[in-house]
Amino acid sequence: MQTSSRTYDYRRLKAEYKQLSASSSTDKAMHRLREAVHAVNILLPTPITLEMALLSADGVRKLVRGQSLARTYSACLRNLECLSRHVPGRGNPGLDAVVETHRENAQRVADTCAAALLHMYMSIGTGRTDAFVEHAIQLTAATETAMSDIALVERALGLTHPHNERSPASMDESTGMKNCAVLSHMNDNKDDAVNMEPGYNTTIDRLISSPLLSQSKRERTIISTPAVTPKDNCPPVKFSRENNLITEL
């Protein structure tokens, strides 16, 4: 009987509940935010604080974007460090060109990430570039980055690379205009005359629009046209902007 009474008394005890602390989840979130701020500050000339990053929801979203760009930038630096250990001329001869191509692509992606992050935090009126930054993050976060799209990002950010500027010969080959006169793109000025004779330089004006530019600007490219040989059977022409006529010489 004594045993049963003890059991009965034990069952009548009130259940006690202990409130679990939510500090563990909060600490994890704060740790991730501090990591993001640290990653972004590596690329910023003027570091930001955690309080500055958490002032608004837009600030938090900007911090997430910046961390994504900073991580991709760090990955590119690690790839460049590994590729720098390659010594040209040793081992497989065909490996040198592949390593050089990967090195150029990694450097371009790293420069693009750094420029996008700097523009996002250091420029004025960054609300206009939200869509552009999202696009840049999607490009750089892809497993196989399309370098043609990176070229568009470079142009929008104002980055210049020597390999982006094609020579006149390569432009003639890409457009299929070998040993023939090139017709220039007409602009608004109709008083200028463009000499399209072979052996002369041709000026082409292109209108460039970018979300980062307050207004469109023109880019001028000079193309050298090769001389025409008799076998080409392509007569020289001269284009005049006054009457919009093409006449054979």
UniProtKB/Swiss-Prot annotation:
Localization of this protein: Virion tegument; Host cytoplasm; Host Golgi apparatus
Pfam name, any one: Herpes_UL51
Keyword Protease among UniProt keywords: no
Protein modification: Phosphorylated.
This protein's UniProt keywords: Host cytoplasm, Host Golgi apparatus, Phosphoprotein, Virion, Virion tegument
Gene Ontology CC terms: host cell Golgi apparatus; viral tegument
The UniProt record lists the keyword Phosphoprotein: yes
Family designation: Belongs to the herpesviridae UL51 family.
Functional summary from the UniProt entry: Plays several roles during the time course of infection, including egress of virus particles from the perinuclear space and secondary envelopment of cytoplasmic capsids that bud into specific trans-Golgi network (TGN)-derived membranes.
Assembly and binders: Oligomerizes. Interacts with MDV019; this interaction mediates MDV019 incorporation to virions.
Protein name per the record: Tegument protein UL51 homolog
Organism in which the protein naturally occurs: Gallid herpesvirus 2 (strain Chicken/Md5/ATCC VR-987)
